[in-house]
Amino acid sequence: MKTTGVVRRIDDLGRIVIPKEIRRNMKIKDGESMEIFVDNDYIALKKYSCLDDLVNISKELVESISNEFKKNVFITDMNKIIAWSGNDRKIYYDKNISSYIYNKINERKMINIVDERIELIDGKDIVCNFLMFPIIANGDVKGSISIMSEYDSITTNEEQIIKVIAQFLGKQVEE
């Protein structure tokens, strides 16, 4: 943890204003949930992702699907890729998603792209076949699950599996 040199007062409602520059650098959006940690004299804030609790099961799900279909499969929260299985894991895993993917997730519908260039993470685009379903819990978008391949098309069977997994993860977040 590093110090920023910024000092803020707490108002009478217990609020602290986080400077715009820090919010911009950490990609914290208005209304985004923050987790509070307390340790002796320290209070720390962390961006909250309800999918963090499901990282282990997410990794197992993407691994199983990827092994079966021989394609890249990944799960995102609203900020980064939290589970990846297939080729190029070192390039994509635990990286922030691009604004393009963020906007597509927020459209709250299936995205099916055939042989087009897409930007998965900032500064890294790829020509591929790509299918994405949003993960929706309690009416809010929490992330997405995607399958992609540079060479093979996405089949109807694969589409149905990805859709079911998106619904399953949404139900898990609700509980």
PLM segments and residue spans:
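Cytosolic beta-strand hydrophobic patch enriched in CBS
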Residues: F74-T76, F133-I136
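Short, Lys/Arg-enriched, disordered terminal segments
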Residues: M1-V6, E175
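Juxtadomain coupling helices with adjacent low-complexity linkers
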Residues: V55, K59-S64, I97-I101, M148-E175
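Short hydrophobic/glycine-rich mini-motifs in sensory/regulatory modules
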Residues: I135-I145
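A short beta-strand signature within small-molecule sensing/ligand-binding domains used
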Residues: D125-P134
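Structured interaction and signal-relay segments at domain junctions
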Residues: V62-K124
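Intrinsically disordered, low-complexity terminal regulatory regions
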Residues: V7-A83
